Amino acid sequence: MDDPGHDNEFPDLSSFDDESSVISTRGLEAFGRKVTTTAAHLIAPRADPASNPTYQTAMTEVHRQLRRPGLQRSMFSMARTTPTDMVRSRLSTKEIQSRALAYVPDELLQNIPDGDSSYSLFQGFQASFPDFTEEGKKHRRRVSRGRKLLDEGPTIPDGTPESVQRLKKEKASMMHQFEMLGIRKNMASSEIREIDAKMENLAGMRRIILERLATLEQDEAILEHDIVEVEGRLEEAQELANEAGELAHTPKSEDDAASEKGDTPGFMSQSVYEKLPSVGSTSSKKKPRSIRRKTMPILHEHFEPGTMIRSMRAHHDSITALDFDAPFGLMVTAAMDDAVRVWDLNAGRCIGVLEGHTASVRTLQVEDNFLATGSMDATIRLWDLSKAHYDPQGSQFGKDDEDDEDAIAFENPDDHPVDPPAGSMSDCPLFTLEAHLDEITALHFRNNVLVSGSADKTLRQWDLEKGRCVQTLDVMWAAAQASALSTSDSTWRQTSRAPDTAADFVGALQVFESALACGTADGMVRLWDLRSGQVSRSLVGHTGPVTCLQFDDVHLVTGSLDRSIRIWDLRTGSSTTPLRTTTPITSMMFDTRRIVCAAGEDVVKVYDKVEGRHWDCGAGAVETEQEREPAVVERVRIRDGYMVEGRQDGIVGVWTC
């Protein structure tokens, strides 16, 4: 049996040649002895009383820690760089953890960026650490109070070593605080620059998303236009199918049978022509279909208030009336040049010109796809804008191939308006209402009821289904009756009316079911009941002609030439004056948040009902490089924060409000 003492001996390496020896023999022998001794203790049986369980316990703990991936990576990295540390280690768990966690490989150190800051990371932490806790703030206050107490304590005579040492310490402390303040100032400046860079990046991202939203809304408008067209064609096809079914089930008469056999000599006589259905009569009997928008644009809601969306020259003369159905929808403008133009606000393009009136249009209203216009020729015309031959995808109108110049968007407001091809609005006229004796100055319609006011001092109620007048209201008689009840002088007098201003007798009106509000030149606002044809209430407060009004469920807002806007409470009849101007008010409208009015200036006056503040919006409030001053605003309309204003020079501006 071999001697067990020879089991731990290494073979004699001196027999190998020097050329074949690769590593040092002495180091290998030392490493071998350590491994052999450690293995002997670890592999020794547990029942052996000579074996020490300390190594087994240590290896169990080390094995549990070494199974962590992060610790293994650190150990392998440390073994590659400093293998002698692994040999010197006593296999202590805390020692191995400390070495593995505290060691940073060179690969990570090489990736540290070179900063251009004047202070180090530790200095920044040291300068900002007191601000993180309340204890740091209390410590600074205690130091400040301690200095005051030291200053108030017994004085040390100058020139002594104690005073010099004290002053040095105080100077060192102050210099340290001064250095920390400088570091904090640099840190604050760096944070501001970082915030500015982030804000710039966010602003760029916002612009990109706004462009994407604009593209989506344009595609949505085009698709909605196609859907409406398909729905119209489907409805016509369904009507034709129903008519064909009715004709198939209708028995033929003797005359029809004889005409089919050709027995009568006058096969295509005049009587037969009279029996044939007329295409024009069939289309005229067809009830117009109201088309409501399926979605509402929201692009303008993401712009700052007072941002100009578009400016275009709509007419050669002053704007007399304008209205639009929805943001980025259809707009109709009228001017003193007797032209009535229809616009696509999404593209800034003129769709067509409405022809029929023989004089200037003074008032108009757009509701869904219907348009009502009142003219100085004493007539009211109804139009269906959905029948316009217009292609929103490009510059083509209908199916005709025209030049692109016929439908350009007027980016330069000084450009002259280009007339679209003739006949693009030929199918839009519905019918004409004729009964007034003088020019139409105000109108409003809702559902099948239209009320118009004229310079003949009457109001007329119209049934749009039958196309006829159903009631006439005499404003002069109502004014005389009210005057007779209040004073012996029954003569109607125009109060506070400028001698050089010809105010309209009926300045504004609005109808809702059987309720009618009318503002006249005597400064009165009368509330009519259309069921009885009588004035139910008169609102007195304006000292000049009423030029504009609008009401909702609770409030009525009026504008007058007396340079004031009044808000009336319909429940109590009381009024407030939130806005006064220096010039007469010619146009006014409000939405859920704002009241806008045109008051003879180059800006639109805006009153925020929620915040209770006033501000100006328009070309006059924006610094531009134009050589000439903006013209006076004559008409203004607003819907959901989307405002359109028309000026005396024929330019129409579109703004966010």
UniProtKB/Swiss-Prot annotation:
Sorted UniProt keywords: Coiled coil, Membrane, Mitochondrion, Mitochondrion outer membrane, Repeat, WD repeat
Chain coiled-coil ranges: 211-249
CDD domains: Mdv1_N, WD40
A Pfam family: WD40
The WD repeat ranges on this chain: 314-355, 356-393, 435-474, 495-538, 541-578, 580-617, 626-657
Basic residues composition-biased segments: 284-293
Subcellular location(s) per record: Mitochondrion outer membrane
Membrane topology according to the record: Peripheral membrane protein
Gene Ontology cellular component annotations, sorted alphabetically: mitochondrial outer membrane; transferase complex
Superkingdom: Eukaryota
InterPro entries to which the protein is assigned, alphabetical: G-protein_beta_WD-40_rep (IPR020472), WD40/YVTN_repeat-like_dom_sf (IPR015943), WD40_repeat_CS (IPR019775), WD40_repeat_dom_sf (IPR036322), WD40_rpt (IPR001680)
Region (Disordered): 245-293
Residue ranges with Basic and acidic residues bias: 249-263
Annotated S-S bridges: none
Its job: Involved in mitochondrial fission. Acts as an adapter protein required to form mitochondrial fission complexes. Formation of these complexes is required to promote constriction and fission of the mitochondrial compartment at a late step in mitochondrial division.
Family statement: Belongs to the WD repeat MDV1/CAF4 family.
Protein name per the record: Mitochondrial division protein 1
